[in-house]
């Protein structure tokens, strides 16, 4: 089946209203028709309020003239138009128009969704855990927000390049490698660990021991520093051990990504070490252009746009006084590489809001260097913090950072108890499968349904609830529809456009038609919570429809139309959840 774009009903109405405005007020040609969904009609236009001054008339009079023009045009999109209030146009669609739209979307493998991002190459930087350290709650938001954006933009046609900027370089590796060499009995390889024990957990503990020895033993500290030099110089044995640590860590990260349903692959990894050979070029280029300058032995870029608390220009550290490089230089190398080598049209950095100043300075420097031009869009996709019940950054009772795997285990355990209480007939295997889908989905949805710039409290009890705006509620809505369709068996689900619409059918059909618009808003604003809100409203509209409109007990023609609505709702929910990286179970 070939995909075919279906023009949304709201867009059809916008075109009709715009044409009527052009006839009544030619000097306002191209003005926004300001069409929005309405509780008083299918859609409402407020354009007359904004244009009345230009027309030198009252908004109500202009609205009446536009309504007359709409009727005269004989628009197939607008069946009825009335004027209310100070000049609102209330616009109603013909029942046949709505049913035709349902049939068109149902017939299309992509639900009729357009490809507005087609041919746009978008590089998304997200997740970025540190090698030899466990992923913790701080990695949750970047990983799932970045993945959701990658999915949505890819579905809308963008060529998405995922970049996992691993923290895989630095002095800490010299310390860890030296400790491992001096303690050959240390257990940390995945094959040697007990089931359920993570390589990165073992390495993290060994690093802490190495740090303790580094601080207590000057001799070990000297040997660790020498090991750093050996690593940077490419010493064969040291590099081999470093690569071993990186490979084992990536296996552990893969377990988290697989469990979260994240699309990142090993080929998407381009850590700090990847850019090592490019750092000197960055220094030379910025120095030659007069952008970087000496500051007490260090090389810095003084901002022309941002000042610090003391009123002096904010600085970006290009090279330290000891000749080393930090993440400022590495991030400059990433942006140049992604523009010059990956040929990005759009760059997205899904990173904690606390890094806002850093990215302002990196983007400014890249523009001054000529790497970042108006042909490339760049954005720091900032996000807030996951909080504990006390309203502070989420920690364990001992004050440690919460491990991401522990957090997921807690959610799936709670989901298992909740699902078991609702359905006592489930087998243990079914219960485990459903609990994993519900628990992981609950964690992801709770995060994604929160405006990304806001902090939110991690409340697992609320997350796994079957009530309210939760992932479990949406998953359960999908399973209810699947139950109806299983009972329907081979019953026909074709659309008869001549049938009258029940108000609940109409509300559901209009909500289904708004799916593409919600996705476009996510892509434009980089805010996944808008898709969550859409899906929640869709599930609510289906609940209202199901309570008001019998499906299987209806007469054959009505039943066929209502089954078509069920099929389209299930497909839309399933597609929407998939774009969030959340499973849509058949049973629950």
From Swiss-Prot:
The keyword Protein transport does not apply. It catalyses: tRNA(Arg) + L-arginine + ATP = L-arginyl-tRNA(Arg) + AMP + diphosphate. Its main location: cytoplasm. Keywords: Aminoacyl-tRNA synthetase, ATP-binding, Cytoplasm, Ligase, Nucleotide-binding, Protein biosynthesis. Its EC number is 6.1.1.19. One of its GO terms (biological process) is arginyl-tRNA aminoacylation. One of its GO terms (cellular component) is cytoplasm. The keyword Oxidoreductase does not apply. It is found in: Cytoplasm. One of its GO terms (molecular function) is ATP binding. It comes from the Bacteria. A motif ('HIGH' region) lies at residues 129-139. InterPro entries: aa-tRNA-synth_I_CS, Arg-tRNA-ligase, Arg-tRNA-synth_N, Arg-tRNA-synth_N_sf, ArgRS_core, DALR_anticod-bd, Rossmann-like_a/b/a_fold, tRNAsynth_Ia_anticodon-bd. Belongs to the class-I aminoacyl-tRNA synthetase family. Monomer. This is Arginine--tRNA ligase. It comes from Frankia casuarinae (strain DSM 45818 / CECT 9043 / HFP020203 / CcI3). The gene is argS.
